[in-house]
């Protein structure tokens, strides 16, 4: 009988087996089973040093879904952490519901490095983001409530702190040079899905996929993309007598 099982139990069990067999990879004593712990776990493995622009750890919201079963609880806790000023959420990609997460301190430090102490951006961080850490802002609110003029807003967009929203007069919070991250992320996603797609039945054991190598341009690493494809429902995760199996969903067979 096939039954569901938590991702982290599977991954950690595989890592413990490697340790017993002499692999250099360390075992994990505490398994993240809540939103905050899962966020910290994923962020801690983000390869900042591999990026020219030294991105801060970027975690996709749906990656946390691979660890925590109840997505409503994840969304609720992330929103609470955002309102408490611990992290920021921003849209990434073309879909409105695809969100990324960065710790607030990491975000502000990265902005300081990237934007060369711009007075407009410093004003935005202190007067807007620190007080009202929203995912998007209206032109009216920025001008009326916070005193930004059109030239200021244009600079925020030019520097990559804001991006134009689909609705007229609205702007999404963003991060400078996010396009570089997205290019790398999508490249790695395609690469790891190719490993699954090339198998005979479009399925692969989790511990086998963890051992696969990605191209050098896939900077984010195998684990990062495993959390992605499970959390985004690109694959179904099922348990078999041989271990956890990842099975590609029909709509992802040809990408």
Where are these regions (language model features)?
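Non-catalytic recognition/regulatory regions in large multidomain proteins
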Residues: 1-255
